[in-house]
A protein has these predicted regions:
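Short beta-strand elements that form the blades of beta-propeller/WD-repeat-like
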Residues: 15-28, 32-33, 52-66, 71-72, ...
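A short beta-strand motif characteristic of beta-propeller blades
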Residues: 2-9, 39-46, 77-84, 120
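Short, positively charged
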Residues: 11-14, 36
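Short coil-to-beta transitions that initiate beta-strands within beta-rich domains
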Residues: 6, 11-12, 43, 48-51, ...
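Domain-scale macromolecular recognition modules
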Residues: 31, 35-36, 44
């Protein structure tokens, strides 16, 4: 039987926090939210990722599922785009205008793909 305290602790361990637009980007394998210091949400977005890693530049963030194939792109107002890649994501970086560069592992080849802020 899992107690509430154990579930709360697991959530804290899997949740990460980064500064974005002077606020806090809170993200986990289940979703992301931009919150203030009281944890009141400006926006939230649900997704499923095994190993989410965020990169932030100014008002833009990308959350990539490292070793997976999905990325979510956010600005200060919420989700701007979504990407599903053909190969496993090694690393993703975002520019201050929302352009995403991703290194993908294609087995015998390594790819660097670029995506606009809407995921195209």
């Amino acid at each position: 039987m899992i107690s509430f305290r154990q579930v709360e602790q697991e959530d804290i361990v899997s949740t990460k926090y980064e500064v974005m637009s002077g606020k806090i980007l809170r993200y986990s394998p289940d979703g992301a939210a931009l919150v203030n210091s009281e944890m009141d949400a400006y926006w939230s977005s649900l997704y499923e990722m095994q190993n989410p890693v965020a990169d932030i530049r100014g008002d833009w963030a990308v959350i990539a599922d490292v070793d997976g194939t999905s990325m979510k792109i956010f600005d200060k107002d919420g989700e701007a785009g979504s990407v599903t890649t053909s190969y496993s994501i090694v690393k993703a970086r975002i520019s201050s205008n929302g352009l995403v560069a991703a290194i993908l592992d294609g087995g015998d080849s390594t790819w660097i793909n670029y995506y606009d802020s809407d995921g195209t």
